[in-house]
């Protein structure tokens, strides 16, 4: 089972990590000099690898009583909706400001250069529901923390935050006050 301590590694085995890393492209100096971007699109286009990644991630949570998965647009939707299907639970879209038509909860969060706002419908989560946060990459943790704060503001319980990729040097898991699982770590 995955490690529940937020400061310790909840991640795939080294063999699984290496298998998935083969399909994550490294792009140096993008979006700016000195940054190495981890591009998951090669993994997304390999159906069998994408399926295995989703199954491997979802397997960790099959006995956790997950009622909902909350994911942030855009790549988070890809993984979160697929995991919700695998776990047979509901899916909650967390959107950037101004994208949802109904009454919303909003949460501001810090970006590398400025601020951002995430939103979720006010009726998306019932009080006490067990929610798994899913996104593509954990970097600084700002987006995941804002998502967790939205879940808590709605009365939901954050079970864990799960990511396809974790950039460990940015210490994003230290920002979160919930367990963290990552399939691949750099």
Language-model features and meaning:
Residues 34, 69, 91, 161:
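Residue-level signature of catalytic and energy-coupling elements of molecular machines
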Residues 2-16, 22, 145-186:
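PRPP-dependent phosphoribosyltransferase catalytic core
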Residues 2-66:
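Active-site-facing substrate-recognition patch
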Residues 89-131:
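Short, glycine/charge-rich flexible loops or terminal/linker lids adjacent to PRPP-binding catalytic cores
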Residues 66-67, 129, 159:
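Conserved acidic residues
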Residues 65-73:
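Short glycine-rich phosphate-binding loop at a beta-alpha junction
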Residues 78-89, 148:
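Short Gly/Thr/Asp-enriched flexible loops that form oxyanion-binding sites at enzyme active sites
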Residues 136, 141:
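Conserved G/P- and acidic residue-centered "switch" motifs that form tight phosphate/ATP-binding loops
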């Amino acid at each position: 089972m995955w490690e529940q301590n937020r400061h310790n590694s909840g991640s795939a085995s080294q063999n699984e990590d290496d298998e998935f890393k083969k399909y994550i492209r490294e792009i140096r100096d993008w979006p700016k000099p000195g940054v190495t971007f981890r591009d998951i699109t090669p993994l997304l286009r390999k159906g069998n690898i994408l399926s295995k990644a989703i199954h491997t991630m979802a397997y960790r949570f099959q006995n956790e009583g997950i009622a909902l998965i909350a994911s942030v647009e855009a790549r988070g939707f890809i993984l979160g909706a697929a995991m919700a299907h695998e776990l047979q639970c509901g899916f909650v879209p967390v959107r950037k400001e101004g994208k949802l038509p109904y009454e919303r909860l909003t949460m501001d969060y810090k970006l590398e250069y400025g601020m951002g706002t995430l939103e979720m419908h006010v009726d998306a989560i019932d009080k006490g529901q067990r929610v798994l946060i899913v996104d593509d990459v954990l970097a600084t943790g700002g987006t995941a923390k804002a998502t967790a704060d939205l879940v808590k503001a709605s009365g939901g319980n954050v079970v864990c935050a799960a990511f396809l990729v974790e950039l460990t040097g940015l210490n994003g898991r230290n920002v979160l006050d919930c367990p963290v699982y990552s399939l691949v770590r750099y």
